[in-house]
C-alpha cells in the first residue's frame, strides 16, 4: 500500500492519481408552439416547454488515500433527476388608428418542477479495485430526496402610445405558489409606467441638430420574491433516528404557516439623451423598498431548532445607473465605438420584526445598517515590542460609544459592525475598433468601495496555530524582532491567540480593474473568397480575464461577501476560424 500522507497530511499528487471522480449530465429540452389569428388584430397562442436533465455523480476514495484508508476504500454514487414543465397561453390584441397605438395581452401560465435525488455510499473494497459500488462489501449510507414546486399565474398588460411622443403601460399579475400555505400563497403584483419623448415636440425642433433625442421616463410598481425553500411553511420530518431498535421520525425543520411573499415596491425615474446622433446617454435613479423581507431568523436552542424562515422586516435600496454609448469615429475604412456604464447602490435595513438586530454568520442584520454589514472583532495591528496581535476591546460606554483599548486576548474584544461589502461604484468600459479587414474589441470591468471577508484566513493566516497547513505569502512580512513595524504578528508554534480568531484583519478591499475580454479578428477580403465559393472567412483570437489590477490579490476580487477555498475564474486564450458558405 502506498503511503498517502505525512503526519496525517495529504499527498495531493498521489491522492489525485488513485482517487476517481466523474460527473455526467444528459439534458433534453423541447418546445411546442401553436398560434392562431382570430381576427386581424386578435391572436391566440400557446407555448409548452419541457426541460429535463439527469446527472450522475460518482466519487471514489482509494484505500491508498488518507480518507479512503479509514474505510478500506469508499465509493459514493449520486443521481439527480430534474424535469420542468412550463405552459403559457396568450391572447394578444393590437390596433393602430391614426397616431394612436394600443396593444393588450392576457395570459395564463403554469410551471411544474419535479426533483429527485438518489444517493448511496459503500466501503471495504477488494484488493483488485473495481470502483463500482457492487465491488464494495459494506454499506455506509443511502438516501432519497423528493421535491416538487408549482407556480400558477394570471397576467394582463396594456400598452398605449401616441404620435411616437407619449407612452403609457400598465401590467398586473396574480401568482400562486406551492411554496406558501393556502392562506398566503397568492400574491398580486402590478406596475405602471409612462414616458415622454420631448425631442419630438415642435418646440424642440430648433435643437434637433444637437439634441437628437430627449426622453423622460417614470415607473412604479410592486413585484414579489418567493422563499428559496420549497416547504418553508411546513414542518418536515426525517426518518433515520432509531428508538428501541426501530426507525423513528423526528422533526427536522420547523414550518411557518404565516410565511408570505417578499414584496419590492420600486420607483424609477429615467432620462435618455441623444447628442449629435452620435452619443446616447441613459441615466436612471431608483428606490426600492422591500417589505416582508425573507430571512432565516435564529432561534433559541431550547426550541430544538437553530433557525426559522420568516418575513422579518423592511429594507430600502437606492441607487443610480449611468450608461453612455458613443460612435466616436465612422469613416469608410475605420470605425470606433465606446460603451461605458456605472452603477451605485446603497441599502439600509429599515425594520426588523421582534429584535432590532441579530447575527447571521459573519454579518449583522441591524436596523439602520446596510444589509451585508460584516460583524467581527476589530484588529488593532501588532505590538512592535512583542509581536503579539492586538485587538480593540470595543466595550460600549454609557453614551453608546465604543472604547478603543488595545488587548492581546481576542476573548476580551467584542465584535462590532464593521464594513459593508457592497461596492460604492461598479461597471464596465467597452471599445470596438474596425479597420478595413481587422476588428478589435475589449471590455474592462471595475469595482471600487467594496469589501470581502477571507474565511480561509483561519488556516492561511493562523500565525502558527497549525504549522503543517499551507500559509499565506504575507508571512514574509511577519514580526521577527522588537521594533518591527508590521501588521502580521509573530509566528508561534501552536499559537492560540493568532489569526485563527476571526477579526477585521481578514477583511479586504475588492477594488479592482480587470481586462474582462479581448477579441482580435481578421476578415479575409471578399474578392479572395468569391473565387473559392466562400461567403465569409474570419480568424480570431479571444481571451478572458487577461489582466487584473486588485487592491488585494490573494483571491479573486470579483468575489464579495464571505470568501472561502473557491476556484478562481480561468484566464483563457482561444484561436478560431469562422467560415460561412
Predicted regions and their residues:
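Extracytoplasmic gating/loop element in the C-terminal half of outer-membrane beta-barrel translocons
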Residues: 138, 177, 447-538, 543
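Outer-membrane beta-barrel signature, preferentially recognizing the C-terminal barrel domain
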Residues: 16-19, 28, 137-155, 241-280, ...
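C-terminal beta-signal and terminal closure region of outer-membrane beta-barrel proteins
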Residues: 232, 236, 312-317, 361-388, ...
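Surface-exposed loop/turn segments flanking beta-strands in extracellular/periplasmic regions
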Residues: 1-3, 7-14, 59-74, 114-142, ...
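Extracellular loop and loop/strand-boundary signature of outer-membrane beta-barrel proteins
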Residues: 15-20, 29, 33, 70-79, ...
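Surface-exposed extracellular loop regions of Gram-negative outer-membrane beta-barrel proteins
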Residues: 26-97, 101, 149-181, 185-200, ...
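Outer-membrane beta-barrel transmembrane domain signature of Gram-negative proteins
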Residues: 23, 27, 68-167, 220, ...
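Conserved small-residue
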Residues: 310, 329-421, 452, 461
Amino acid at each position: 500500500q502506498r503511503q498517502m500522507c505525512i503526519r496525517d497530511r495529504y499527498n495531493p499528487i498521489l491522492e489525485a492519481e488513485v482517487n476517481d471522480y466523474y460527473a455526467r449530465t444528459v439534458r433534453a429540452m423541447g418546445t411546442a408552439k401553436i398560434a392562431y389569428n382570430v381576427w386581424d388584430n386578435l391572436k391566440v397562442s400557446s407555448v409548452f416547454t419541457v426541460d429535463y436533465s439527469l446527472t450522475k455523480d460518482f466519487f471514489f476514495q482509494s484505500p491508498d488515500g488518507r480518507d479512503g484508508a479509514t474505510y478500506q476504500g469508499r465509493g459514493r454514487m449520486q443521481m439527480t433527476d430534474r424535469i420542468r414543465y412550463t405552459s403559457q397561453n396568450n391572447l394578444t390584441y393590437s390596433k393602430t388608428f391614426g397616431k394612436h397605438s394600443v396593444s393588450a395581452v392576457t395570459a395564463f401560465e403554469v410551471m411544474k418542477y419535479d426533483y429527485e435525488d438518489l444517493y448511496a455510499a459503500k466501503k471495504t473494497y477488494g484488493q483488485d479495485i473495481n470502483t463500482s459500488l457492487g465491488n464494495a462489501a459494506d454499506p455506509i449510507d443511502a438516501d432519497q430526496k423528493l421535491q416538487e414546486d408549482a407556480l400558477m399565474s394570471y397576467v394582463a398588460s396594456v400598452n398605449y402610445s401616441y404620435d411616437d411622443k407619449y407612452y403609457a403601460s400598465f401590467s398586473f399579475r396574480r401568482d400562486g405558489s406551492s411554496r406558501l400555505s393556502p392562506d398566503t400563497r397568492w400574491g398580486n403584483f402590478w406596475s405602471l409606467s409612462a414616458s415622454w419623448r420631448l425631442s419630438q415636440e415642435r418646440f424642440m425642433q430648433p435643437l434637433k441638430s444637437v439634441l437628437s433625442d430627449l426622453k423622460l421616463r417614470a415607473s412604479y410598481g410592486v413585484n414579489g420574491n418567493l422563499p428559496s425553500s420549497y416547504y418553508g411553511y411546513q414542518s418536515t420530518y426525517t426518518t433515520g433516528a432509531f428508538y428501541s431498535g426501530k426507525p423513528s421520525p423526528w422533526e427536522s425543520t420547523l414550518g411557518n404557516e404565516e410565511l408570505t411573499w417578499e414584496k419590492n415596491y420600486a420607483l424609477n425615474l429615467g432620462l435618455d439623451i441623444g447628442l449629435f446622433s452620435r452619443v446616447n446617454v441613459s441615466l436612471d435613479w431608483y428606490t426600492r423598498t422591500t417589505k416582508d423581507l425573507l430571512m432565516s431568523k435564529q432561534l433559541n436552542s431550547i426550541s430544538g431548532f437553530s433557525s426559522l424562515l420568516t418575513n422579518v422586516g423592511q429594507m430600502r435600496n437606492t441607487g443610480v445607473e449611468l450608461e453612455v454609448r458613443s460612435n466616436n469615429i465612422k469613416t469608410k475604412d475605420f470605425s470606433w465605438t465606446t460603451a461605458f456604464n456605472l452603477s451605485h447602490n446603497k441599502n439600509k435595513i429599515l425594520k426588523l420584526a421582534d429584535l432590532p438586530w441579530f447575527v447571521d454568520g459573519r454579518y449583522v442584520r441591524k436596523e439602520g445598517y446596510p444589509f451585508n454589514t460584516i460583524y467581527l472583532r476589530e484588529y488593532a495591528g501588532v505590538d512592535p515590542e512583542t509581536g503579539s496581535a492586538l485587538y480593540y476591546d470595543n466595550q460600549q460606554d454609557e453614551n453608546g460609544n465604543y472604547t478603543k483599548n488595545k488587548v492581546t486576548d481576542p476573548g476580551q474584544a467584542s465584535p462590532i459592525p464593521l464594513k459593508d461589502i457592497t461596492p460604492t461604484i461598479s461597471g464596465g468600459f467597452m471599445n470596438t475598433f474596425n479597420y478595413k479587414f481587422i476588428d478589435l474589441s475589449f471590455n474592462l470591468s471595475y469595482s471600487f468601495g467594496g469589501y470581502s471577508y477571507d474565511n480561509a484566513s483561519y488556516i492561511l493566516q493562523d500565525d502558527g496555530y497549525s504549522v503543517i497547513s499551507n500559509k499565506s505569502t504575507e508571512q514574509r512580512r511577519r514580526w521577527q524582532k522588537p521594533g518591527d513595524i508590521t501588521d502580521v504578528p509573530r509566528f508561534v508554534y501552536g499559537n492560540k491567540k493568532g489569526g485563527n480568531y476571526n477579526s477585521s484583519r481578514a477583511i479586504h478591499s475588492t477594488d479592482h480593474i480587470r481586462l474582462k475580454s479581448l477579441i482580435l479578428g481578421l476578415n479575409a477580403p471578399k474578392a479572395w473568397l468569391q473565387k473559392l465559393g466562400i461567403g465569409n472567412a474570419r480568424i480570431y483570437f479571444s481571451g478572458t480575464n487577461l489582466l487584473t489590477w486588485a487592491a488585494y490579490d490573494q483571491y479573486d476580487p470579483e468575489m464579495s461577501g464571505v470568501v472561502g477555498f473557491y476556484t478562481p475564474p480561468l484566464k483563457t486564450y482561444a484561436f478560431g476560424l469562422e467560415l460561412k458558405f
